[in-house]
Amino acid sequence: MLNAVSRRTLLKFASTVFPVSAMDLKVFAFGARRPRTEGNAIMVTDTFPAQPPELVREMVTVAHFDLQRVKELSDARPSLVKAAWDWGFGDWETPLGAASHMGNRAIAEYLLSQGAPPSLFSAAMLGQLEAVKAVLAGQPGVQRVRGPHSISLLAHARMGGEAAHGVSEYLQSLEGADADPPSPLREEDIRALLGTYVFGVGVTQQVDLTADLQMYANKKMYTYAPQLNWTRKGTMTRPLFHLGNRTFYPAGAPSVRICFTEGSDGMLMSVDDGELVLSAVRKRSKS
């Protein structure tokens, strides 16, 4: 979740677009390269014609907070307003989704003006009460669907402030529009679980489990704040919610299970996403 890091940290993970002067270069053969006649050639990657992942990630990142950069990226590559990024475990987010759960009306309205498909979540944040009612009338129960990072529909309306007050009042009358409380997590369980879990020899084959939750304090996005942070080395933090018996689900992926059990080798972690994805054992403390 992006509130978990500073703007500087976010931008460290993002990269800049190709120079605009390079955009008019023609591709002559897939996997080939234009002769360097003007000293400004580009390679065609294996992912072409899909959008460059580094640009998608940056666009979704800056759509939380930086309107100017959003405009620069969309001016250079207009299709980025419809991009989507997976922060982990299938927690997909679009630029409009990012702006919506942050309550960033200016960015949301700009993205919509550039062709980003509107959503129920953007309508809730923008205070579009009749649109929200129409969707719920056509699809009863859809208020239970969560947005990026498991943020509820009602929370999106809360982030819209006074302009979305009518939507907030309406959603409060509907069952399931807000998040359910997670299972309590005892302090002794937290202490028992924290540490670094290893599932291979590579430097990125480690997961840090931490309990620094100050980033979620006083935030309207979550009615019930996450209880732990799960971070694979080199990736963004995934907030965890407790289901009971030391079993959790990561934000944006309620069907995934992250379980902790005591074993002969120490504390074990397993990740199940329809099938067992990985098992890891916690590093032993140096004596």
Give the residues covered by each predicted segment.
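Ankyrin-repeat boundary/"N-cap" motif
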Residues: P49-T61, K82-A98, P117-A124, V145-M159
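C-terminal segment of N-terminal export signals and the immediately downstream linker at the start
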Residues: D24-T61, D66
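Conserved ankyrin/ankyrin-like repeat signature
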Residues: R69, A106-I107, A131, A163-V167
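Ankyrin-repeat C-terminal turn/loop position
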Residues: P78-S79, G115-A116, P140-G141, G176
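N-terminal secretory signal peptides and thylakoid transit peptides that target proteins
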Residues: M1-F18
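Peripheral terminal and inter-domain segments
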Residues: A177-S287
